[in-house]
Amino acid sequence: MLKIEEIKEILPHRYPFLLIDRVTEMDIEEKLFVKGYKNVSANEQFFQGHYPQEPIMPGVLQIEALAQAGAVAILSMEKFKGKTPLFAGTNKVRFKAKVVPGDRLDLYCEIVKLKGPIGIGKGIASVDGKTVCEAEILFAIG
């Protein structure tokens, strides 16, 4: 549905911190959610130090990828276009499996609460249909 160039028109993030490659499904009218993915390459900068002998995608970056998925939905809404998404916190974070080079990290983020410019998203990241990370993401739009 949205390729990387279209995502870059919505999000202010850029390499090496743009962590969503494609949006495959999005609804900003009813349920307010995004499905997308990040192809996790062996060439990612973070693998140089985390960990060179057994590369694992840092959990905080998995959460950031989920937050960026949610931000695509929010910033696609007319009233928030061109604004900056801000992290406000996380709750109920769980990591269930490793994400390694060659994985496709599937992202799902649904905005479950939105009051003015502040809200909560529920994110689930998975690899091959298995949940690897889930989190409640608190955000503000600046």
Swiss-Prot record:
Record-level GO BP terms: fatty acid biosynthetic process; lipid A biosynthetic process
Residues annotated as catalytic: H50
Alphabetical list of Pfam families matching this protein: FabA
Chief place where the protein resides: cytoplasm
Keyword Iron-sulfur: no
E.C. designation(s): 4.2.1.59
Uppermost EC category: lyase
Keywords associated with the record: Cytoplasm, Lipid A biosynthesis, Lipid biosynthesis, Lipid metabolism, Lyase
Transmembrane segments: none
HAMAP family (UniProt xref): FabZ
Protein name: 3-hydroxyacyl-[acyl-carrier-protein] dehydratase FabZ
